[in-house]
Amino acid sequence: MIKKLLCITALAVTNSFAFAAQDFAECRQFFANGEIPAIDHKQELSTRALCFSNFAVLHSGKSHTPLYVAEKLNRDSVIAAKDNERTNRFFADARLPQKERAELGDYKDSGYDRGHMAPAGDMDTAEGMAQSFSLANIVPQAPQNNRKAWASIEKATRKYVTRASGDVYVITGPVFDSNVETIGSNKVWVPKYLFKLVYDKSANKAWAHWIENADAAKIGKPISYAELVQRTGMDFIPALIN
């Protein structure tokens, strides 16, 4: 099944990569060594780079979802986030052209949760918390997956960060298969799988959580960075390969 996955998970044409890299100039701090994930395959996904105060998003106007979301966490930020009140005010991101963005109505009665890629629980400022509810940071997620298995993965990641000696870089995103399901009038793509890559730079180690976007999905053993690259076709942290 994995071999049949489309690498449109987070791929774009070469000139789109240059465009994205240029636009991420104001938020390169969320990427390890300031390096934007390498894009090797040619898929036209109408990508746009979006900078937020606590994370960065590569958004696709074709899927109407993020392709990946990058964060930089550390012990202090995770501890501060515990006291930050959740807002729950979802909104369509006006920075995106109307034809490229998801709208609140797309998720209404869809049977899917509005699943955060950069979790609200990671946000250590009021501004970051509010911004995390942008639909540019959201994918259609199976409700029980979002509230149980995926929530456990998010909590485990924060727990690890509190024990880390330095900054930890996290990249989260959806993976779509060839028979993609859509929701709403804008045909927002529903992921087949979700991944969360964790890179502890000071310890020089990385791993990824990989889970099916289904209510009955169970948390499996984390996969290696090399396996994530193989499954997605994306080199998220070039330094780890080079």
Question: Locations of the language-model features?
Answer:
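Domain-level detector for secreted/extracellular nuclease and nuclease-toxin modules, and
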Residues: N15-N242
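Sec-dependent N-terminal signal peptides
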Residues: L5-T14
